[in-house]
Regions:
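Residues that define the loop-to-transmembrane-helix transition and helix capping
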Residues: 17, 43, 103-104, 168, ...
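Membrane-interface helix termini and inter-helical loops of multi-pass transporters
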Residues: 9-12, 61-74, 124-138, 142, ...
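Alpha-helical transmembrane segments of compact multi-pass small-molecule transporters, enriched
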Residues: 22-36, 51, 112, 116-117, ...
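Specific transmembrane alpha-helical segments of multi-pass solute transporters/efflux pumps
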Residues: 1-18, 22-23, 59, 147-165
Length: 216
């Protein structure tokens, strides 16, 4: 709940391009944490794959214009995004470090219950400053989507992935988010497919492939 809440809060103060660039640091932070906690060793393929995937993300979110990244202005929202990076990396690393004696779905139930308790004070705080929810059809459709997919399906798959291949290799797949977003924008909003989309996709997919290789 901390990760999701802080992401939504940070986006009020920073650009999407800044947020995505900061989130691209999650695999690097996870590699550092898993090494410090002696959970998983890092190899040269993972480091090179991480570098390639970050280049690919930069290509997509900057529309192939490096000037957009060079002249970015960072702000308080970006600092909050760094909090997201730390919390998600720590969460992913601890999932591998501690073997929970409950099923994946039971663990998700515990997380959701704890998350609700954490979010209640935030709800009343926002209400106190005049932010109100509109309980209309759109609200309930969005709520259904968030509960069924990001809150249950995604967390289940994420936990299962870390259990099988470990945090270092799992977090590399986060780099696919900008690529999937670009593909969905092309399909749903009829945005034009550009060369930088192709270049970014090649770099990201190559980076993920390399990160899953093992040294001999």
């Amino acid at each position: 709940s901390t990760f999701n809440s802080v992401v939504y809060f940070a986006l009020n103060y920073t650009q999407v391009i800044n947020a995505v660039l900061v989130l691209a640091a999650i695999p690097a932070a996870t590699i550092v944490l898993s090494s410090l906690m002696k959970i998983e060793k890092t190899n040269i393929f993972q480091l090179f794959g991480l570098l390639l995937s970050i280049i690919g993300i930069g290509s997509i979110i900057s529309n192939g214009d490096i000037q957009k990244i060079i002249f970015l202005n960072f702000n308080n929202g970006d600092l909050w995004m760094l909090v997201c990076v730390i919390t998600w990396s720590l969460y992913s690393t601890l999932l591998k470090k501690h073997k929970f004696k409950v099923s994946q779905f039971s663990l998700i139930q515990l997380m959701v219950s704890a998350g609700i308790l954490f979010l209640i004070p935030q709800f009343f705080y926002e209400k106190s400053i005049g932010l109100e929810l509109n309980f209309n059809k759109a609200f309930f459709l969005i709520l259904f989507y968030v509960v069924m997919f990001p809150a249950i399906a995604a967390y289940y798959c994420w936990q299962k992935g870390i259990e099988i291949i470990g945090p270092n290799r799992s977090t590399m797949f986060i780099q696919l988010m900008p690529l999937f977003s670009a593909v969905m924008a092309i399909i749903i909003f009829n945005e034009k497919f550009e060369l930088y989309h192709f270049v970014g996709a090649i770099f990201i997919l190559t980076g993920i492939y390399l990160s899953n290789k093992k040294t001999q």
